[in-house]
Amino acid sequence: MNYSLSAILYGIAERISEFSDRPIYKSPTQQKCEPPCFFLCLMPGGIRDEIDNRYFSDINIDIVYLQAPNIVNATTNVFTVLENLDQKLDTIPYTIGNETTSMIVYNRKHHLENMDLHYQISLHTRVKKSEVETLMKSMEDIINVKKQI
């Protein structure tokens, strides 16, 4: 199954919506947003070739939970969200067309920055490259057919 970044982000948003009704945005927005809310930010990853016409892709995502500044129970809110993310993000649902599967989440870590929670995850996918027919090979096949006739 090939992957789509938007389908991966949708799967993460689906998991977050199981425990929170806060708005979820795909990336930091220039528009005015009302905290508390979540942002799903893509971080640098990597791609490397593998055998059997496949490649291995690292997808890194930073899930940012923003909360209103100077609230009384800010620490409690952050740790509640952190616990929920830890419980819900072992795997994420992934659907392309009629196919649904689960993707395992790796390298989960978090840190606080100005009382905003950054929960970083990694996904590892192996993707089969689309096969491109070599034109020379097909030309050789045509020549062999002509010789046999």
Description of each model-found segment:
Residues 34-43:
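A short, hydrophobic beta-strand-centered structural micro-motif
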